[in-house]
Amino acid sequence: MNTTATQTVHADRLPDVDTDVAIIGAGPVGLMIANILGLQGVRVTVVEKLDQLIDYPRAIGLDDEALRVFQAIGLADTLLPHTTPDHWMRFVTKDGHCFASIEPRTDEFGWSRRNAFIQPLADRVLFEGLQRFEHVQVLFGHGVEAFTQDGHGVSVEVTTSAGRRRTIRAAYMVGADGGNSIVRRALQVPFEGRTKPNQWIVVDVRNDPVGSPHIYMHCDHERPYVSAALPHGIRRFEFMVMPGETEEELSKPENMAALIRKVVADPDKVDYIRKRVYTHNARLASTFRVDRVLLAGDAAHIMPVWQGQGYNSGIRDANNLGWKLAMVAKGLADGRLLDTYTAERRAHARSMIHLSEVAGDIFAPNTRFGVRFRDAFVRSFNVLPAVKRYFIEMRFKPMPRYEEGVVLLPPPQHRGGWLARMLERAGNSAPGRLLGLMSEKRESFLGRLVYGKDPLAGSPVGRMFIQPRVRTADDRLALLDDAIGNGFAVIGWGTNPTFGLTPQARALAEKAGMRFVLAKPDVQLRHGDDVPDGVIAIGDASGRLKEWFSRLPQSVVLLRPDRFVAGVCSPQQVSEAITELAGKLGMTEVPPYAEASTPSKTSRPVLDPVTVTQAAGA
């Protein structure tokens, strides 16, 4: 990786840069996308206006989906020392009584579902991961002044912190430059939503003066606050800023001591890292793509912190967008593939905003009615065990489910009558947001009541595939993704997924880098006569794959690089499924019966001279 702050070439200009993808913002989302593209041999230039990575804590929660993405780019083991697995969230009363605890213990995707982490160290892991790639560079101290785009690429004008200018020419650009995104504002993309009336002061300290594990949400009517244990002896406190208070006033030693005294006996012995006031926003961009420019992370959506989903939603964006950008940049797929990014990610980002708002409504209601509603809701746990399990096991969390895009499904049927419209109108109230969130799970009772029966509710298509531990041919136990590798995969349970494959389907599969996998009971793995050349055999060490396939009439699953299920089929339908998937991807045609070759990772699109069709000022 090339890391550049400034170079002395001319008095006012630096050498221009030609790249495949320009990423604006060296935060976690931009760095994650750069790693995904770097692994695919795509040339990347990351542009960051600051002179270095941000070194203070921000996000503190990492979920299993995000850890799976770190695993995919080969950095999970480097990140894990900076995490705390099984980090439960406990809601307590003013006197310290725990009335609810979110502690999911399942590991469908191979990792703990709730993890604490230190974001600056995670960002550092992502940044140092780019050192693996000579074709990726990060330009610190470079601020975007303007950009233009035409039918062949994007031209970005940047200025260094020393006042020198340069032009970056890319086939595509990603705006991952935060909630105040220059890129989004220049594109004039609406960013609609609301700002919460209350601010919060966040205080991070070293040498944890409390020491108790997990995160505690203190539902104090007078001043709600949070106490969270983080790795490496760091503790985070968050206190609601009451009307009339200011950051300057609260930061005074005597006022800060009064706040900390709620949790710590001797606030004078606290080792502060930083204090900062935040405003919670809930906003969503109207689209995540404008021609050759895409938005990701906080530039596309921002949400309150209460479920720690802002960071994780950004990583989901990177996971969805990265492989698609790589296919388009390498000439494997048509640019229309990028339209599926908004189609697939925007709806779920909206759901996570709703989830975050509901969690805030429960923790810190804005009205007396909200407090009474919250208390009544919590008391129901004692008489309704099913409600308590729903809450504790995080069943309320909307999981990504793609009904359109790169999925082999019929066109979605948007249902919902007067009850759905009523819930939508009630979305500005706490009860309305809660009921609306619960109804988003279409297979639930409330979801069926609001939207009617969903014929595809039980289908795994469009959902993330499980990741159990499997046994490899050399008798190792490994997580599924490590055993079969990244990229597209076709997994057959107890059947050879390549049997009867047509030459055209095989050519398409080879062009896409698709791997074929035969999964079978662990005890059968030593018998290899049923495993042809070019097929990966895995043993179902835990029985989870057999359980997953037993719910379906089909025994073959097609996986996307982001590990979402693209489709399911019978063994005799694999050729048709691959051909249909290639059409969804917009893959360039492979002539029937032609010998396919894997494209070079270093292949580059040819960029024509700039013809400005769109101008945007910073």
Curated annotation (Swiss-Prot):
Annotated binding of FAD, by residue: 20-49, 288-298
Catalytic activity field: 3-(3-hydroxyphenyl)propanoate + NADH + O2 + H(+) = 3-(2,3-dihydroxyphenyl)propanoate + NAD(+) + H2O; (2E)-3-(3-hydroxyphenyl)prop-2-enoate + NADH + O2 + H(+) = (2E)-3-(2,3-dihydroxyphenyl)prop-2-enoate + NAD(+) + H2O
EC code(s) of this entry: 1.14.13.127
Record pathway: Aromatic compound metabolism; 3-phenylpropanoate degradation
One Pfam family this sequence matches: FAD_binding_3
Region of interest called Disordered, as start-end residue ranges on this chain: 592-618
GO terms of molecular function: 3-(3-hydroxyphenyl)propionate hydroxylase activity; FAD binding
Keywords, in A-Z order: Aromatic hydrocarbons catabolism, FAD, Flavoprotein, NAD, Oxidoreductase
SUPFAM superfamilies for this protein: FAD/NAD(P)-binding domain
GO biological process, one term: 3-(3-hydroxy)phenylpropionate catabolic process
Cofactors required: FAD
Stored NCBIfam families: PRK06183.1-3 (NF004829), PRK06183.1-4 (NF004830)
Family to which the UniProt record says this protein belongs: Belongs to the PheA/TfdB FAD monooxygenase family.
Known role: Catalyzes the insertion of one atom of molecular oxygen into position 2 of the phenyl ring of 3-(3-hydroxyphenyl)propionate (3-HPP) and hydroxycinnamic acid (3HCI).
Protein name: 3-(3-hydroxy-phenyl)propionate/3-hydroxycinnamic acid hydroxylase
Organism per entry: Cupriavidus pinatubonensis (strain JMP 134 / LMG 1197) (Cupriavidus necator (strain JMP 134))
Gene from which the chain derives: mhpA
